[in-house]
Amino acid sequence: MAQSSLVAAAGRSGRVIGDYAVGRQIGSGSFSVVWEGRHLVHGTVVAIKEIAMARLNKKLQESLMSEIIILRKINHPNIIRFIDMIEAPGKINLVLEYCKGGDLSMYIHKHGSVPEATAKHFMLQLAAGLQVLRDNNIIHRDLKPQNLLLSTDDNDAALKIADFGFARSLQPRGLAETLCGSPLYMAPEIMQLQKYDAKADLWSVGAILFQLVTGRTPFTGNSQIQLLQNIIRSTELHFPADCRDLSTDCKDLCQKLLRRNPVERLTFEEFFHHPFLSDKQSYDFTRSRLDSRTMNDFHSSGSSPSRNIEEISQEDGLPFFLDDDSSGPEGSPSSFKHTSPMKSSYGFSVERREAALSPLKNMDLSSRYSRVSHRAETNNFKFEGHRLSDRSQFKPSSLPDSRSFSTQGRGDSPDSMDQDYVLISGPPVDIPSSSSGSPKPFNYPFKSHSPPVEFIKRNVTNLTAPMPIASATGNNLSRFGSLESQNCIPGTSHGSLDLVDAFEQPSTNSLTRIRSLQKCAAAIAELVHERGENGKHLEAFSIQLVILAIWNQALHICHTQAVSGIEGSLLQDINRVGRNISHGGSEKLLPQIQKEFVQEVERAEELAKFVESDNAKMPDAMEMILQAALALGISGGVDEVMGDAENAGNLYSKAVRLLVFLAVEAQTLILNPPLTLTNSVRYRLRTYIDSLITRLKHLQSHRRTSYPQKQ
């Protein structure tokens, strides 16, 4: 009867996909709709995942194919069964087995904590599925209750691992560096952006077991940063008071799986043979260990009950929007959004080509960005060979001639293991042992079909480590002084120059550093606007990439300080010098920086639309910034001679800001290759800055003399 009604419904709607009549919609995600289907001849109920390929960028398409390959390769009772793939114009339909029991998160939401015997039943099946993945050198990387499906809604249900969009093949002893998965079940080494191996899945298993027997996740937090802080600060795993009846073996397994240090965590073999899983009566783990085979084609005869996707997660098995959990039951503990880092250079990739008409090493757009092909893949615009020319030098009579900046070249970054979210090593930096680590490059996987704001909201919080930032009890003021403390003349809006110490290193005060980066970005943004107004869109785009790198550095600092827990945290900094950034505490600092970053991302995407060809030569942003600074200094001198002191002060201040950026901050940004200044260039920059500040002080002194303050 049910079969005839479904076929009749399909006939009325005209929806038939391959050999399957399409029934009601049972779920939807960011890129797909899931339908209940039934085989027209055999009556087998299936889940049909209809994916609109036009909505997937290249990397998501690769992730989809990766999922298909994994499911096609493995045939195991604890792995979701792949039945068929049916292609249609602009769409791919995945036919999967149908699980009428829903997922484990729905089960936990309905039942709360479960008896230990039930938890063991599910864990034995999860272990069996993981054994198959391990035998095939696969890390799932997104194990969570939402991705564990149940054949029925009872305590004897078969558990099946699903959603392999994040999974990847990992060679034995290999380490990955991508950020994937859901925060509440994510291993701390992943959240801290450290290399990780298959043991990351075991942390997730421990979190799932803990939630099964207690009804709650082992660690919580109002944000991913707070969650990580709680994990780091925890010295032991605490069980709720109402869980005193848990067996010693159960508690022991949870504790050993949830060890913060992966070296101390159980190995897979120790996990498989742990006493808690030693009872084979409820599940024959040995027989189930490895029942996988390679299928010769996409069609697999037979079916078994599978996924009830009443409420499918928004990422829908595709690794872009992470852990939105819009599908989860109301009140589900997985309620906040996952964040992700980004990769390589400072957002884009540009390969160096020899320029015919300029001593600069002009760059080409080697990776197709946004509008050029709308492939929206993970793009890298790399500045190769930052070299500033001798042209248009600012040469006051008292200053030495300017020479070109020198750079230290660097080869291309190694191929990433995962192109969606991967970290690759940044330029080598000498840092003290107390540092949080050297910087790592990042990428912006922009999407042509999704607003950048939505991407950043989900993926911008957890970033790579910044240049070393240590707490400071006082401001480490620049040898150039602070214009703010010198009654800077009106209009010098770029404010304080307390940016560097005697060794021209960035301030060790975290908030002072962020303020410096903010002002540098504002000054450089004027150059972008000016070139955009003059139709020099490629130049504007090149400079805009530097702004993205600046805001990425600010996000680095904010994130590192938030998770460090050291004395002199951002909250203390804000209370001490919290001007221009945030007045509401450290919890408001990161969102404000994120907002700025999002706006700059959108500007970059708009400018990228004007990149007409992959062979367009990318101008050197650092050279343009230097020349702009020198031109501002010259214009300021002209205005001073002409008696326009206020405008001269404005121009001098902007020039100083740009020069200080080149002398200090630019060397700390994630550029490929990194900008390296010789000692002679540093000296010349210092001389320029000193000369300009001398003129500013002269103007200030003249203004005080001309307009004495009333007593």
Swiss-Prot record:
Region of interest called Disordered, as start-end residue ranges on this chain: 318-342, 383-419
Basic and acidic residues biased stretches: 383-393
Family note: Belongs to the protein kinase superfamily. Ser/Thr protein kinase family.
Binding sites annotated in the UniProt record for ATP: 26-34, 49
All copies of domain Protein kinase, residue ranges: 20-277
Motif (AIM (Atg8-family-interacting motif)): 421-424
UniProt keyword list: ATP-binding, Autophagy, Cytoplasmic vesicle, Kinase, Nucleotide-binding, Protein transport, Serine/threonine-protein kinase, Transferase, Transport
UniProt function note: Serine/threonine protein kinase involved in autophagy. The ATG1-ATG13 protein kinase complex regulates downstream events required for autophagosome enclosure and/or vacuolar delivery.
Catalytic activity, EC: 2.7.11.-
Cellular component, GO annotation: autophagosome; cytoplasmic vesicle
InterPro entries: Atg1-like (IPR045269), Kinase-like_dom_sf (IPR011009), MIT_ATG1a/b/c (IPR056281), Prot_kinase_dom (IPR000719), Protein_kinase_ATP_BS (IPR017441), Ser/Thr_kinase_AS (IPR008271)
Protein's name according to its UniProt entry: Serine/threonine-protein kinase ATG1b
Extent of Polar residues compositional bias: 394-410
Gene: ATG1B
GO biological process: autophagy; protein transport; regulation of autophagy
Organism listed in the record: Arabidopsis thaliana
Active site annotation, chain numbering: 142 (proton acceptor)
Location of the protein in the cell: Cytoplasmic vesicle, Autophagosome
Domain of life: Eukaryota
Uppermost EC category: transferase
